[in-house]
Each structure stands twice: as structure tokens, then as C-alpha cells.
From Swiss-Prot:
PROSITE patterns: THYMID_PHOSPHORYLASE. It comes from Methanosarcina mazei (strain ATCC BAA-159 / DSM 3647 / Goe1 / Go1 / JCM 11833 / OCM 88) (Methanosarcina frisia). It catalyses: AMP + phosphate = alpha-D-ribose 1,5-bisphosphate + adenine; CMP + phosphate = cytosine + alpha-D-ribose 1,5-bisphosphate; UMP + phosphate = alpha-D-ribose 1,5-bisphosphate + uracil. This is AMP phosphorylase. Keywords: Glycosyltransferase, Transferase. InterPro entries: AMP_phosphorylase, Asp_de-COase-like_dom_sf, Glycosyl_Trfase_fam3, Glycosyl_Trfase_fam3_N_dom, Glycosyl_Trfase_fam3_N_dom_sf, Nuc_phospho_transferase, PYNP-like_C_sf, PYNP_C. The keyword Transferase applies. GO terms for cellular component: cytosol. SUPFAM superfamilies: ADC-like, Nucleoside phosphorylase/phosphoribosyltransferase catalytic domain, Nucleoside phosphorylase/phosphoribosyltransferase N-terminal domain, Pyrimidine nucleoside phosphorylase C-terminal domain. AMP binds at residues 168, 194-199, 203, 264, 288.
């Protein structure tokens, strides 16, 4: 045991970690990656790193996650070697493809949330599930543990409705229409959404154009019960916090383990008390689900997991080979969605998809008979009831309920991409559309993104603008434009694709 004084480094690193001078580490008999227990007015386990110059002997360097647990910073703390977390043994079992039990999964998720595992240990867990997969029981246990280790919302009124899109399609702004449509028909739909990680705008990024999106779980409940719906950022609610910690490791590895994805999606639905959930599964090249067959498997797995958790899940396999609507990027997409709410003016792909998925929820919730939900959704849009409900949601979340589509500002710097030939739009590259919008500044720069002037099958003439890039900063516009010119994300072909001459040519 050693008595050490504390020195705070005002940095959040996502885990309980401390710095020991190498002299003190040798005295304690610990190495980098080992654990120590810190005893002050409370006891805390932390992972060790060592240094020969950042902290002097007799001092324990602590980062913000540890700092927040202690109050008396003038008093020394006791530091003793600690045993490795039992979760490390569970992870090794998973790496060895050995079965685990529910209590082991619960302990593992608790250690993830409490930041008792190192990045190496988290990486091993992610790798194990990525390579070996998980059984149905293990996925259910993981989902339940993710729910139980975070905030939950318990509503007095049921049913609770929810919707989730698997993602991968640019411009998928449909939640901005679905939530007010469903809420306008007397159903509760507390939509917690993500911010974009690799996309040009998650639903939370979009809604932030209209109102604040960061609320506690209790505030989400109050907003939903007051106006029927909410569109908020899930990261502010502490719902399924284990998911955010796993994403931090998955992102640099560029992997998204299938069974962890299932648990992540369903944990967030379970935490808000959802009874009925519709899943949007876009399929096609460039999406997260390339084929209909893969979409059907994902649908079966989501429905099965929902059944195990007591949720009624329906899945919609949707067309994902080109953007939804004609705008990509927060302000551009919100402007497009608000125009639909205001006057039903907008791309058919946006209106049809939103009405179809909202219709499924209306049928699941008993607001519409079977096969009549879509028509009720369209009527809710046409009548202005969805717009009125959206205004109520915006106001309840602290925004201006009188905002109109024309009030929404887009990036001041623009550049066009022109068709290089007469012909028809044959193909979209979703990934490059998203990348161009991100290079322009989306989602952090709300006014950045792209406007798509011609969609698949539409005729163009040489010199017609087919894409406009919007940016708030000129240098970002230049970067996005250079990439668009290099990658050609919208393919235009003439009716004659290729001429192949005869073997002998003309005589």
C-alpha cells in the first residue's frame, strides 16, 4: 500500500485510468494495464499506466472519470494493487468460443458501463462476438443487461410506439414526418435518435435545426406525455450507455458486430418501454444491408429478439439504392421535410416511404385497420394535423413553433456538378454522396450538404446541373467539389451504352 497525493488531468478518456510514476509502480509491483484500488472517501478501481516524467514520485495522476468520484483533493489516498476484473475471464471464454451464462453477461456489461475494462479488453470482447457470433440466449441477455445498466422510461399510458432505420441511405429524414403523423393520431412515440457517426446527419442532428435535442429521460417522458411525441438525442438520456462505450472502440476498427448491433437497437427500444416497433431495413448496393436475402435474415432476427423481450416488431424492407428525397445534410433535409408537412410539396420517395412506415405503426397501435394505415398517414399530412403536431413537439423541446421551411438557412457557398453527356441517370453511389456532404461540413455545419437535381431514370442534357454542394466555409466547399469531380457519384449514360464492332468490320 502507498499513500499518494492526487493530480487531476482535465481530460475525458472514457475509462477509469490513472498515471503512476514508474518508481511508484515498481514499489507497488504493478505494470501498465494492471489495476489498482484507490481508497479515499470512497473506493474505486482503475487501470494503470506509467510514466517517468508526467507525474513525480508520490503522486497519482487521475483523469476526469476518476476525478469525479473524489471530493477531498487535498488529502492523500491509499493505493493498493487490485485483481483483474472477472469480466476478463468471461471475454476469454468468448474468444475460446465457450458458452457463457446470463450472470456473466450482466457482470461484463456492468463493468463496461462502470469503465472497469481497458480498451484492449473491450476490443477483445468486440472481436470475439464479431468472429464467433452469439447465441439467441446470449443476445437476449446482452440486450437486457444493456437496458438494466442505464436509464429507463416507464409510461403510464400504452401502447408506446417506436421506429428505427438501419441506415446507410443518404437523406433518410423520414422520422421528421413519421413521429408527428403517429402522435397526431393519439399514439405516444418518444423517438430517441443518434447523431451521425459516418453519415451526413442523424435524426438528432436534423431535429437540432428546429429545437434543442438534449434532454434527460424524465424530460423525454414529460415532453412525450404532453404532446404525444419527441425527437431527441439518445446520448443525453443515459439510455443503454454501454452502447456508446462499445461504439467508441468499434469505430476505429471499422467493424459493427452483427449480434451487438441487434442488442444495441433493441436495448434502446426496451429502455423507453416500446410495445410496438417498426424497423426500416433499406437494401441495395452501398447500404448496410446489400441484398434482400440479408434484409430478410435481419428482419427475422429482430422480430425474434423483440418477441423474447416482449415487444411486437414488424420490419419493412425498403429500397435503398438512392437517396430519400433530394436533399442531404441537416438544414437541407429539414427544409425538405418541413415543406412536405406544410404543403405536401416534396419528393415522392420521401412522402411514400414516410407514409408507408407511419401507416404500419398506426395499424400496430390500433389507430387504423389493417391495410389502411398508409392512407390515414397521408390524410394526416394533407389535413395539416401532422404539421400542427410537429409545431407542438418543436415548442415542447424549446424551439420556435412558428418556424417555416423558408426560414431555414443553408450554406452560403455553393458549387454545381454538371452532366457531361445527354442521357439518363443510371446509378447513385450512396457512400460518395454521403462523403461529399461530410466534406462540405455536414453534420456539424448545419447548412452544409448536397442537393440532388436528377434521380435514377430521369433524363438530363449535357450541361444540366445534377448536384449542388452547399457549405458554410469556402475551403470545405473546395474539398467537397474536388471529391465530387473525382468520384462522379451520379452516373449518367446515353441510351447507347457501348458499340461493339463486327469481327470483320465493313467491306
Amino acid at each position: 500500500m502507498m499513500q499518494l497525493k492526487l493530480e487531476h488531468y482535465n481530460i475525458k478518456i472514457g475509462q477509469h485510468k490513472v498515471l503512476l510514476n514508474i518508481v511508484d509502480a515498481k514499489e507497488l509491483g504493478v505494470n501498465p494495464g494492471d489495476r489498482v484500488r484507490i481508497r479515499g472517501h470512497q473506493s474505486l478501481s482503475a487501470i494503470v499506466d506509467t510514466t517517468d516524467d508526467m507525474v513525480p514520485p508520490g503522486t497519482l495522476g487521475v483523469f476526469t472519470e476518476v476525478y469525479e468520484h473524489f471530493e477531498d483533493w487535498d488529502k492523500p489516498v491509499e493505493v493498493v494493487p487490485s485483481f483483474r476484473s472477472k469480466s476478463a475471464a468471461v471475454i476469454k471464454k468468448m474468444l475460446d468460443k465457450k458458452p457463457v451464462v446470463q450472470d456473466e453477461i450482466k457482470m461484463l456489461v456492468s463493468d463496461i458501463v462502470d469503465e472497469n475494462l481497458s480498451d484492449v479488453e473491450l476490443s477483445a470482447f468486440i472481436t470475439a462476438s464479431y468472429i464467433h457470433g452469439m447465441t439467441d440466449d446470449e443476445v437476449e441477455w446482452l440486450t437486457r443487461a444493456m437496458i438494466d445498466t442505464g436509464d429507463t422510461i416507464e409510461f403510464d399510458t400504452h401502447p408506446i410506439m417506436d421506429k428505427h432505420s438501419i441506415g446507410g441511405v443518404p437523406g433518410n429524414k423520414i422520422s421528421l414526418l413519421i413521429v408527428p403523423i403517429v402522435a397526431a393520431n393519439g399514439l405516444l412515440i418518444p423517438k430517441t435518435s443518434s447523431r451521425a457517426i459516418t453519415g451526413a446527419g442523424g435524426t438528432a442532428d436534423l431535429m437540432e435545426v428546429l429545437s434543442p435535442v438534449e434532454f434527460s429521460s424524465q424530460e423525454v417522458k414529460e415532453i412525450t406525455e404532453k404532446v404525444g411525441g419527441a425527437l431527441v438525442w439518445g446520448g443525453a438520456t443515459n439510455i443503454a450507455p454501454a452502447d456508446d462505450k462499445l461504439i467508441k472502440i468499434e469505430y476505429p476498427l471499422s467493424i459493427d458486430p452483427y449480434y451487438q448491433m441487434l442488442a444495441s437497437i433493441m436495448a434502446k427500444k426496451g429502455a423507453i418501454g416500446a410495445d410496438n416497433v417498426v424497423m426500416d431495413i433499406p437494401v441495395g448496393p452501398g447500404t448496410k444491408v446489400p441484398t434482400v436475402q440479408e434484409g430478410q435474415k435481419l428482419a427475422r432476427d429482430l422480430i425474434n429478439l423483440g418477441h423474447r423481450l416482449g415487444m411486437n416488431v414488424e420490419c419493412a424492407i425498403t429500397y435503398g439504392s438512392s437517396p430519400i428525397g433530394r436533399r442531404v445534410g441537416p438544414s437541407l433535409e429539414v427544409k425538405e421535410a418541413m415543406k412536405v408537412l406544410e404543403s405536401m410539396e416534396g419528393p415522392n420517395s420521401l412522402i411514400e416511404k414516410s407514409a408507408a412506415l407511419a401507416g404500419i405503426l398506426l395499424e400496430m397501435g390500433g389507430a387504423a385497420p389493417r391495410d389502411q394505415g398508409k392512407e390515414l398517414a397521408l390524410e394526416t399530412l394533407r389535413s395539416g394535423k401532422a404539421l400542427e403536431k410537429m409545431k407542438q413537439i418543436i415548442e415542447a423541446q424549446g424551439g420556435d413553433p412558428n418556424i417555416k421551411s423558408d426560414d431555414i438557412q443553408t450554406g452560403q457557398y455553393t458549387a454545381d456538378i454538371f452532366a457531361s453527356t445527354d442521357g439518363y441517370v443510371m446509378e447513385f453511389d450512396n457512400k460518395w454522396i454521403i462523403e461529399i456532404a461530410r466534406l462540405a461540413g455536414a453534420p456539424n455545419d448545419k447548412g452544409a450538404g448536397v442537393a440532388i437535381h436528377k434521380k435514377r431514370g430521369e433524363q438530363v442534357k449535357k450541361g444540366d446541373p445534377i448536384l449542388t454542394i452547399y457549405a458554410e466555409k469556402e475551403i470545405k466547399l473546395d474539398n467537397a467539389l474536388a471529391t465530387a469531380q473525382r468520384t462522379n457519384p451520379i452516373i449518367v449514360e446515353g441510351m447507347l451504352l457501348r458499340r461493339i464492332p463486327g469481327t470483320y468490320g465493313f467491306q
